Curated annotation (Swiss-Prot):
Organism in which the protein naturally occurs: Prochlorococcus marinus (strain SARG / CCMP1375 / SS120)
Record's function text: Acts as a chaperone.
Protein name as catalogued: Chaperone protein dnaK1
Family according to the record: Belongs to the heat shock protein 70 family.
Keyword Phosphoprotein annotated: yes
GO molecular function ontology, one term from the record: unfolded protein binding
Pfam families per UniProt: HSP70
Xref: InterPro entries: ATPase_NBD, Chaperone_DnaK, Heat_shock_70_CS, HSP70_peptide-bd_sf, Hsp_70_fam
Induction per the UniProt record: By stress conditions e.g. heat shock.
NCBIfam families attached to this UniProt entry: PRK00290.1 (NF001413), PRK13410.1 (NF009946)
HAMAP family: DnaK
CDD domains, sorted: ASKHA_NBD_HSP70_DnaK-like (cd10234)
Modified residues (Phosphothreonine): T198
Keyword Chaperone among record annotations: yes
Length: 666
């Protein structure tokens, strides 16, 4: 098996890791950062930008820049909470009730998976550059409380990026792998994972390389962004009260509020108060309006009291499901930037009488764990075993709309569970299997994963036919359902992906489109890299010419300086054109000219300690001036007035300059 990377696909930031020589580490992106903002955007020229480049245009181009997309993956419009709709860009429901993101500049609507695929592609591209090899496989993490639809949608996003998902791994489990993969002692660990958009709790037993997940719980609509929104609401409400202007109705103002709120939240993790300044946030009857205020930690914590209360319930549920008490916990691992908030750390200390571990980086630990899982799959790490669980109960709808659970939550996976059902009417020739996921008693109150029909059942009285329904969950947490008529042996099975925002045809079309775009993107990148390299060389040449003039005067290495100046002008001219081939030739010529200049300067410096060498250099320079190939043919006496080489002219792209032209040295 080839190289497999580990990807933490986060709501706010994403990270990629890899295993090298048995040790996991994080790969920095092309910008040099170990985390990549999970932001995608289109510039005013309709060019796709991802990561930090996209983040920079959040305020100036809010309609075409998209963040926090993970909250929409695999979810229908009806499942979204109101706070998820408070974004500066436009989202809507399509005819099937799926979430679509509107991009005015491209005049297109995108499924969240399609945009998130661009984040995965950037992570893979940056890793390929670092590792100098092609990567097409990954372990991708998801919140432990992601349902089957959200997991399938995550796989779709990777598929659109041209990446095969070898394993879907729960984020808290990944954090536990990173924390305990090199520990030999036994312990009971609580992983408290508060990310940008989701919250997860997992309880694990770690012993001699075996990671046994006992229980998991969480909230996929609660994260650090909700704490930001508390500050946004506080600022917007005060401003509206004072000026009767609702800043949330203006996209640019809303984005500025989001950015300053995130910054204030981060600063209050280390300070007791922080200033908030937003000049020219709006315009009133008497001119521009500004926000100048201060937020202290006590006020911030009072704003977030309801969010802190929401963090408590999943912890209690996980403890109850595991059969453990808080006193049974030996270690606590904090994951996600949200756990840096003092009020969150204080909450954890009130729940579990254990000081949280400081041995892991909350922003990178999940990607490290994903890289460890990749090492397990490739066989590089052989002494580790992971036993995960399914986060939510799975079942089907029975008579009266009740939910019949076949696989309870926190069941170890992979797992297969079957039960026998019958018809509800006499002479019924088919049955419809409705698959649901959740903890409510009525099926309709849970999440519908899909349905299919088993036909060809022989006529019989009600309750006589026997239909066996089997649920299979693989190691990725993906579900397959089958139904078999025991009388005829007729069988119908389906892989559940009804919650995905994209059907199979859409996925295939987008894959082909992504391949086409990938070629175009590679050509664009190559062009940009070529121009950037040329600009770097131009700057080096200009700096070298200045240094030589200051050190040796205008006549030191005069001929070589002139050659550099000519080549330099050629490169600058072709930078303004689209002729990359000529630019490449001009760059090569400038490199040769710089080499000649540097060689001559080195020779000049040697004359300081060797006068005889200085005489040789002088006569050598005179010879070069009189008999250089730029002035004469190979035979110096073969002079002819029409010989173009006499003038030493250069020809790039049809532009001729002669050494006797006044413009030649300008």
């Amino acid at each position: 098996m080839g190289r497999i990377v580990g990807i933490d696909l986060g709501t706010t930031n994403s990270v990629i890791g890899v295993l090298e020589a048995g040790r996991p580490f994080v790969i920095a992106n092309a910008e040099g950062s170990r985390t990549t903002p999970s932001v995608i955007g289109y510039t005013k020229e309709s060019e796709l930008v991802v990561g930090q480049q996209a983040r920079r245009q959040l305020v100036l181009n809010p309609k075409n820049t998209f963040s926090n997309l993970k909250r929409y993956v695999g979810r229908s419009w009806d499942e979204l909470e109101e706070n998820s709709l408070n974004v500066a860009y436009t989202i809507r429901a399509n005819n099937q009730g799926c979430v679509r993101v509107t991009c005015p500049i491209t005049e297109r609507e995108y499924a969240p998976e399609e945009l998130i695929g661009s984040i995965i592609r950037k992570l893979i591209d940056d890793a390929e550059k670092y590792l100098s090899e092609t990567i097409d496989s990954a372990v991708i993490t998801v919140p432990a409380y992601f349902n089957d639809s959200q997991r399938q949608a995550t796989k779709d996003a990777a598929l659109l990026a041209g990446v095969r998902v070898e394993r879907i791994l729960n984020e808290p489990t990944a954090a536990a792998l990173a924390y305990g993969f090199d520990k030999s002692s036994s312990s009971r660990v609580l992983v408290f994972d508060l990310g940008g958009g989701t919250f997860d709790i997992s309880l694990l037993r770690i012993s001699n390389g075996v990671f046994d997940v006992k229980a998991t719980s969480g909230d996929t609509q609660l994260g650090g962004n909700d704490f930001d929104q508390k500050i946004v609401e506080w600022l917007a409400n005060d401003f509206k009260k004072e000026h009767n202007i609702d800043l949330r109705r203006d996209r640019q103002s809303l984005q500025r509020l989001n950015e300053v709120a995130e910054k204030a939240k981060q600063e209050l993790s280390g300070l007791n108060s922080t200033p908030i300044s937003l000049p020219f946030i709006a315009t009133g009857p008497n001119g521009p309006l500004h926000i100048e205020t201060k937020l202290d930690r006590k006020t911030f914590e009072s704003l977030c009291k309801d969010l802190i209360d929401r963090l408590l319930q999943p912890v209690e549920v996980a403890l109850q499901d595991s059969g453990w008490t808080a006193d049974d916990i030996n270690d606590v691992v904090l994951v996600g930037g949200g756990t840096r908030m003092p009020m969150v750390q204080q909450l954890v200390k009130t729940i579990v009488p254990v000081t949280p571990s400081q041995s892991v980086n909350p922003d990178e630990v999940v990607a490290i764990g994903a890289a460890v899982q990749a090492g397990i799959l490739t066989g590089e790490l052989r002494d580790l075993l992971l036993n995960d669980v399914t986060p939510l109960s799975l079942g089907l709808e029975t008579i009266g709309g009740l939910m019949k659970v076949l696989i309870p939550r926190n069941t170890p996976i992979p797992v297969r569970q079957a039960d026998v059902f019958s018809t509800s009417e006499a002479n019924q020739s088919s049955v419809e299997i409705n698959v649901w996921q959740g903890e409510r008693q009525l099926a309709s109150d849970n999440k519908s994963l899909g349905k299919f029909r088993l036909s060809g059942i022989p006529p019989a009285p009600r309750g006589v036919p026997q239909v066996q329904v089997a649920f299979d969950i693989d190691a990725n947490g993906m579900l397959q359902v089958s139904a078999t008529d025991r009388t005829t042996g007729r069988k119908q099975s389906v892989s559940i992906n009804g919650g995905s925002n994209l059907n199979e045809d859409e996925v295939n079309n987008l894959i082909e489109e992504a391949k086409d775009k990938a070629d175009v993107d590679r050509r664009k990148r190559a062009s940009i890299d070529q121009r950037n390299n040329a600009l770097t060389l131009v700057a080096q040449a200009e700096r070298r010419l200045r240094d030589v003039s200051l050190e040796f005067g205008p006549y030191g290495a005069e001929r070589q300086q002139r050659a550099v100046e000519v080549s330099l002008r050629d490169v600058q001219d072709f930078l303004d054109s689209d002729d990359l081939a000529e630019l490449d030739l001009a760059v090569s010529s400038l490199q040769e000219a710089l080499f000649g200049l540097n060689r001559r300067i080195s020779a000049e410096k040697r004359t300081d300690n060797n006068p005889i060498q200085g005489i040789k250099n002088t006569f050598g320079s005179l010879k070069d001036e009189l008999f250089s190939d730029d002035y004469w043919d190979d035979d110096p006496w073969d002079y002819h007035p029409n010989n173009n080489r006499v003038g030493g002219g250069r020809d790039y792209g049809g532009r001729n300059l002669d050494r006797w032209d006044n413009d030649f040295y300008n």
